[in-house]
Regions:
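Alpha-helical cap/lid subdomain in secreted, periplasmic
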Residues: 42-45, 58, 65-184
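Serine-esterase "nucleophile elbow" of acetyl-processing enzymes
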Residues: 1-75
Length: 184
């Protein structure tokens, strides 16, 4: 395993006792590790805690190895997975992803799983996203196809957050929630 990934996972494990169970975990690679999730969730005052357990450069195979430390030990009710962008050279990435989903289902049977499609385009992303889509049952495992382009990186983050925040909720959206999201 990559030493950087091992170090980051170890650091995350050390702070797991500061988390609340039954909340939301985002588990991803480079893109989500750089996503301003805390700034956007704080701005919208979401009712749930969101823990970003994304690690720059994380590949699916490594994600399986650190799953307990980064996700399972938190006991989330929802898990958002954004992996695959670093796996283009791994011919087994799709089967590893399937194994990751199965492991989460086994260890967290009550958790909802949301797979976030790759946003970088190209033939690998298209094929990988199709494989992810085939893992969905639309009950406990769902697929999210994020907006891929916008006028700026900030605008893109905001648009993607608006998409994701709909899945973060545990209660119906209110008018004040709508206005809060619209102001992003």
């Amino acid at each position: 395993m990559n030493e950087y990934v091992r170090m980051k996972a170890s650091a995350m494990k050390k702070i797991n006792d500061l988390t609340l169970s039954g909340e939301i975990v985002i588990f991803g690679s480079t893109y989500m590790s750089e996503f301003p999730i805390y700034e956007l969730t704080n701005k919208c005052k979401l009712e749930n805690a969101v823990y970003n357990r994304s690690i720059k450069g994380l590949i699916v195979k490594e994600a399986i190895e650190i799953l307990d430390d980064c996700v399972v030990d938190i006991h989330p009710s929802k898990v958002f997975i954004a992996l695959g962008e670093e796996d283009e050279s791994d011919p087994n990435a799709a089967s590893e992803y399937s194994r990751l989903i199965s492991t989460i289902r086994q260890k967290l049977p009550e958790a909802m799983i949301y797979m976030i499609g790759l946003t970088n385009g190209g033939s690998f992303a298209e094929k990988f996203n199709k494989n992810m889509l085939s893992l969905c049952d639309n009950k406990n495992v769902k697929y999210i196809d994020l907006i891929k382009k916008s006028s700026s990186e900030n605008a893109l983050f905001k648009a993607q957050f608006k998409q994701l925040s709909c899945f973060f909720r545990t209660s119906p959206i209110t008018m004040s929630d709508i206005f809060s999201l619209a102001s992003l």
